[in-house]
UniProtKB/Swiss-Prot annotation:
UniProt name for this protein: Nucleoporin NUP85
Membrane-topology annotation of the record: Peripheral membrane protein
InterPro entries, sorted: Nucleoporin_Nup85
Alphabetical list of Pfam families matching this protein: Nucleopor_Nup85 (PF07575)
Protein family per UniProt: Belongs to the nucleoporin Nup85 family.
The keyword Protein transport appears for this protein: yes
Gene, per the UniProt record: NUP85
Organism per entry: Saccharomyces cerevisiae (strain ATCC 204508 / S288c) (Baker's yeast)
PANTHER family per the UniProt record, alphabetical: FROUNT PROTEIN-RELATED (PTHR13373), NUCLEAR PORE COMPLEX PROTEIN NUP85 (PTHR13373:SF21)
Localization annotation: Nucleus, Nuclear pore complex; Nucleus membrane
């Protein structure tokens, strides 16, 4: 093959439309937001993620101004702002790589269910001697292995949902790299356990091939077609006479892609050529194809027999005379040596360290006990590609350095990393530094303090990552993820109950509740963890929200449940005041149903008693009692039952807990205009005496609240005296007259 021929197998970079000015050329159907996601730095070529979704705070060619930003406790509360004169705008800031999608929520929930269902198997116990303990360890390993498989399935489903979404290319590749690391981890530690090695060999081989071949997708179809197109441009040579064909064939074999390798041999027309040219070579290749078809994945003993046949075939071909070119003979001999597990040839035809590692496990000695040796030889031949985030973690996994993979995985996806740490700890791959063999009396003060800290280093890496992830979920502002966060903290294998209780108490008031179901969930957590003070805080928050929505009754009810009795009393009196100012019942069917003793009128809204009992508390009944009396007063007034109406009004006026300024309100709105100005409405001696006594003891012209309230009253009713002092004089005159009427 000439140099020109070999160049055809290389990429022609001149044919690619690389970005010259750092701006990605996207199709016109992309939205502005998606286009922003693909802008690149003109110097480094790195993808630029804008701070804000829409307009940028500082124009590209505008004046230089200081830009600052502040992170909020929730992901959507981050703000950027310019500290310059006359700049008051706030810009919502989106943190890059923060996933708030529905697909992510479903993924997190799925992983949490796996974690929860592990039960006692979340904790690894060192196996001891004995039949019972041996069976327990076997069952524990089987449960944890199934959980690992379920985690992989959840991640694959998540990747499938993200794959075709616009603007999420980076997220897709990060998840794929996480999946590659998990596939390697499962292959090395979650399939072959003790006595189950032989029966799980087939599953191990399948997992090994899945890890290797999904990691990079090589060789791809384009490369294969490129190899087979060489024959069209190489004069006098067939495709199977080129080194590229045999490199491809051996690569497929090393990766365990045996059906594809057989397909390449058949497509190359090698067998028809050998059939007409060299019977020995034809038999060797034909037998090798049959051996590849019968590769034993399920049995080590069968593998030894299979390999023995391959070695005999290779030796027979090497010692036989052939009628083909020396170059083609060398290619076929190398092919047979690769299948036979020859170390030198496996390393020669491997393009990466993981291809040779896979080749050793498939064709040399399929034992994980030799994995460290295989890895060392593979790395000496092909170093780790540091541009792939997954390669070094896979090397660390094979080397047994499980702790080292967690920071890399966390940089790819914190959720996957946290649950990976959990499953590794359950398997016993990473241990809890804090020894669990001490009795509670053996702990020092320092130990006790660390037990009370869920983030103590002594709790282990898995505990730290799970608890950190729980806090991260709370910061996303997605209420669907809060049960997962609380569940992670509650199920933590480390930390005391009081430590978990303290953390939950700190988090729960920040829950972004919307519906009644959300509130019931919060309160159920308070009951489960015995958090009465947090329940009161929740009721207070509810009360303030209801107050903002002008739902006074429910607001008062929540304040009452929170023990905020001063607020209950204050807002109950405000209802009383509002009703007095209007001179009639408030237009609130719930309030009127609470205070009504009579059957509802035809136009009243009927509210079932059980609902009222749920709303009304004992403190509410007490604080709303003045409004209830006032409501009955309105009913008697409307029926013109003046005697009974006056009796109720006097009950309010002489009520010992009536705020001072409300005396002016009752007198100015009801007593003076209805009973004192009308000479036809008689008052008995006791009633007049009661009013006089209250006026003399409680009336205060200098009281600011009373003065302000009276000014508000006379703005609506010009017939009243212009001042409280004048009103007081008129009151005394009218009371004297009423007293005279009573004697006459």
């Amino acid at each position: 093959m000439t140099i020109d021929d070999s160049n055809r197998l290389l990429m022609d970079v001149d044919q690619f439309d690389f970005l010259d000015d750092g701006t990605a050329q996207l199709s016109n159907n992309k939205t502005d937001e998606e286009e922003q996601l693909y802008k690149r730095d003109p110097v480094s070529g790195a993808i630029l993620v804008p701070m804000t979704v829409n307009d940028q705070p500082i124009e590209k060619n505008g004046d230089k101004m200081p830009l600052k930003f502040k992170l909020g406790p929730l992901s959507y509360q981050n703000m950027a702002f310019i500290t310059a004169k006359d700049k008051y705008k706030l810009y919502p800031v989106r943190i890059p790589r923060l996933d708030t999608s529905k697909e992510f929520s479903a993924y997190v929930s799925g992983l949490f269910e796996i974690y929860r269902d592990l039960g006692d198997d979340r904790v690894f116990n060192v196996p001891t001697i004995g039949v019972v303990n041996s069976n327990f360890a076997k069952e524990h390993n089987a449960t944890v292995n199934l959980a690992m498989e379920a985690i992989l399935n959840e991640l694959e489903v998540f990747i499938g949902r993200v794959k075709d979404q616009d603007g999420r290319v980076n997220r897709f590749y990060e998840l794929e790299e996480s999946l590659t690391v998990l596939n390697c981890l499962r292959t090395m530690y979650f399939i072959l356990d003790g006595q189950d090695v032989e029966e799980n060999r087939s599953e191990f081989i399948e997992s090994l091939l899945n890890w290797i071949n999904r990691s990079d997708g090589e060789p791809d179809e384009e490369y294969i077609e490129q190899v087979f197109s060489v024959k069209d441009s190489t004069a006098g040579k067939k495709v199977f006479e080129t080194q590229y064909f045999w490199k491809l064939l051996n690569q497929l074999v090393l990766r365990g892609l045996l059906s594809q390798a057989i397909g390449c041999i058949e497509r190359s027309d090698l067998l028809p050529y050998l059939s007409d040219t060299c019977a020995v070579s034809f038999d060797a290749v034909s037998d090798s194809i049959e051996l590849l078809k019968q590769y034993p994945k399920d049995s080590s003993s069968t593998f030894r027999e299979w390999k023995n046949l391959v070695l005999k075939l290779s030796q027979a071909f090497g010692s036989s005379a052939t009628d083909i070119s020396g170059e083609l003979r060398d290619y076929i001999e190398d092919f047979l040596l690769v299948i036979g597990g020859n170390q030198r040839k496996i390393l020669q035809y491997s393009r990466t360290w993981y291809e040779s590692f896979c080749g050793f496990l498939l064709y040399y000695i399929p034992s994980l006990e030799l994995s460290a040796e295989y890895l060392q030889m593979s790395l000496e031949a092909n170093v780790v590609d540091i541009t792939n985030d997954w390669e070094q973690p896979c090397v660390d996994i094979i080397s047994g350095k499980i702790h080292s993979i967690l920071p890399v995985m966390e940089s790819l996806d914190s959720c996957t990393a946290a649950f990976t740490a959990m499953i590794c700890e359950a398997k016993g791959l990473i241990e809890n530094i804090f020894e669990g063999e001490k009795n509670s009396d053996d702990y020092s003060n320092e130990d006790n303090e660390m037990l009370e800290d869920l983030f103590s280093y002594r709790n282990g890496m898995a505990s730290y990552m799970l608890n950190s992830f729980a806090f991260e979920l709370c910061s996303l502002g997605d209420k669907e993820l809060w049960p997962v966060a609380i569940g992670l903290i509650a199920l933590s294998a480390t930390g005391t109950r009081s430590a978990k209780k303290m953390v939950i108490a700190e988090l729960l008031p920040h829950y972004p509740f919307v519906t009644n179901d959300d509130i019931e969930w919060m309160l159920s957590i308070c009951v489960e963890w015995r958090l009465p003070e947090i329940a009161k805080e929740i009721y207070t928050t509810l009360g303030n929200q209801m107050l903002s929505a002008h739902n006074i009754i429910e607001s008062i009810a929540n304040f009452s449940r929170a023990g905020k009795y001063e607020l209950v009393k204050s807002y109950s009196w405000l209802l009383f005041e509002a009703s007095c100012m209007e001179g009639q019942k408030l237009d609130d069917p719930v309030l009127n149903a609470i205070v009504s003793k009579n059957s509802p009128a035809e136009d009243d809204v009927i509210i079932p008693q059980d609902i009222l009992d749920c709303v009304v508390t004992n403190s509410m009944r007490q604080t709303l009692a003045p409004y209830a009396v006032l409501s009955q007063f309105y009913e008697l007034r409307d029926r013109e039952d003046w005697g009974q109406a006056l009796r109720l009004l006097l009950l309010l006026i002489e009520f010992p807990y009536l705020p001072k300024h409300y005396l002016v309100l009752l007198v100015a709105k009801f007593l003076y205009p209805i009973f004192l100005l009308d000479d036809k409405k008689l008052m008995d001696e006791d009633s007049v005496a009661t009013v006089i006594e209250v006026i003399e003891t409680k009336w205060d012209d200098a009281d600011e609240k009373s003065s302000n309230l009276y000014e508000t009253i006379i703005e609506a009713d010009k017939s009243l005296p212009s001042s409280m002092a004048t009103l007081l004089k008129n009151l005394r005159k009218k009371l004297n007259f009423k007293l005279c009427q009573a004697f006459m």
